[in-house]
């Protein structure tokens, strides 16, 4: 079973508070938590836990937990974070450049096996983009 929960992170009186994400507006920080539970009688082998980056948001890279996540810009090819790409500089040389977190579209963890009756939880925070809000806390 896979359970995805989305909340909003707000600061009240200097303390972080997690609340329902009924409405999210530009600048808000969303917390997404995905829990994988093995309800079968056998071990799930080679689990791949995936958490898509919600549309109109940017991943807050330091919030990824556990920190062993891989990321993707297309949801198909995953690599260790931070993602890098090769680009041509003004003088024609090929240089390696960090991919901005705004380009990340999906996260994936490879925790190995998940025993019967056990659960694993993965999470990350995302900032709602300033150009378009995610209405009602739902991704587009």
What are the residue ranges of the model-derived segments?
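Exported/extracytosolic protein signature
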Residues: 1-140
